[in-house]
Structures are given as structure tokens and as C-alpha cells.
Design a protein with these regions (language model features):
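S-adenosyl-L-methionine
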Residues: 1-5
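Long, Lys/Arg- and hydrophobic-enriched amphipathic alpha-helices
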Residues: 50-185
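A mobile, often basic/glycine-rich helix-loop segment
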Residues: 8-57, 101-113
């Protein structure tokens, strides 16, 4: 039974290991890193029945559309739900169908020294590789909402408006109150 604890995961799930699947004739196929003639490349494997669930999540995906397969994120959330009564997750996210439509270049990112890269095979081991989390591949949540909606529901809109008022009144003074208000906007 879950304890009375709360687990908060801020931009964690997008950093867990994930796979990539491509829509092919006959289903979905894993995409692996392989050695081409002289360099590494992303290589599409044979369709895998273990990925058939993606058809239900992205029924309109076109051939060659790719999506992340978030098995580790799903397992992490499931484990956290066993340990804690509440699990709050903040992350870049969308549905599997939305990710398929947007394309791999929009949901797969690399970073090194806070600078975004482009090719996930460039400088392997020296860059972080992240992805937008497919929410429909996670355990079904009690409540799912955008960060903006969550902040508004928890009074952030009122706080921002109050800070905006202080900034309007004190910006010309430039004191600590004005600076604090500006940082809250």
C-alpha cells in the first residue's frame, strides 16, 4: 500500500532511457543504432509485435513516422505510485499521436553544456539525449493537466497579477520590491 508520501519529478521522465519505433508496413519496428559503411546510423529493424500497442495510440501515423517508446518512464511512474500516495510529474509531454505527427526532429533533443544539438549520433556519450514524454504510454493518471493549468488552479495567476501591479507601480524606482515583482511575472 502506498505511503502518505508525495513524489515530485521535475523533468525526470524525459531523461530516462527510451526506445524509438518507426511505423512500417505491418506495424511498428524498433529503430536501433547500427554501424553503416563508415559511421553510425539509425537503422529500422523488422516489425515487432511488442510494439503493436502503438497502433492504438497513434492510429493515423504515416509510414516512416517515429515515436518514442517510454518503457522506462512507464516503469518509473508505476514504481513511484506503489511507494507514494501522490506522484507529481512535470515534463515536456504530448500524446504518442501528437509526437508522430510532429516528427522526430521536434521531440528528440540533444544537449551539451546547455546548448542544443541536432544529430543524436553526434558526439555520442558527450551529450544528453531527451525526448517529449508520450503521456498515453504512462500509467493512467488520476489527473493530467498542463503546467500552465496547474499553476492557474493553484493561484499562480493571482500572484502573477499582483506582482505585475507592483512592477507597474515600482518599476521606475528599481528597488528590491520592484525587482522581486518583475521576477515573479
Amino acid at each position: 500500500k502506498a505511503s502518505q508520501h508525495v513524489v515530485v519529478a521535475n523533468e525526470l521522465l524525459d531523461n530516462l532511457a527510451f526506445g524509438i519505433a518507426e511505423r512500417v508496413e505491418g506495424g511498428w519496428a524498433p529503430v536501433h543504432i547500427g554501424l553503416g559503411l563508415s559511421e553510425l546510423s539509425l537503422q529500422v529493424q523488422q516489425p515487432d509485435p511488442a510494439l503493436d500497442h502503438l497502433t492504438g495510440l497513434a492510429p493515423d501515423a504515416a509510414l516512416s513516422d517515429r515515436v518514442p517508446v517510454a518503457s522506462e518512464a512507464r516503469a518509473w511512474v508505476a514504481d513511484a505510485c506503489v511507494l507514494a500516495r501522490r506522484v507529481l510529474v512535470f515534463d515536456y509531454a504530448a500524446t504518442t499521436a501528437e509526437l508522430a505527427e510532429r516528427g522526430q526532429a521536434s521531440w528528440l533533443r540533444t544537449y551539451a553544456a546547455h546548448t542544443r544539438g541536432h544529430d543524436p549520433l553526434d558526439q555520442i556519450g558527450q551529450r544528453d539525449i531527451t525526448h517529449d514524454v508520450p503521456t498515453d504510454q504512462l500509467p493512467t493518471p488520476y489527473l493530467q493537466q498542463t503546467q500552465a493549468d496547474w499553476l492557474a488552479a493553484n493561484g499562480m495567476g493571482d500572484r502573477v497579477e499582483a506582482a505585475r501591479q507592483v512592477w507597474t507601480e515600482r518599476a521606475h524606482i528599481g528597488d528590491l520590491q520592484a525587482i522581486a515583482a518583475r521576477s515573479a511575472i
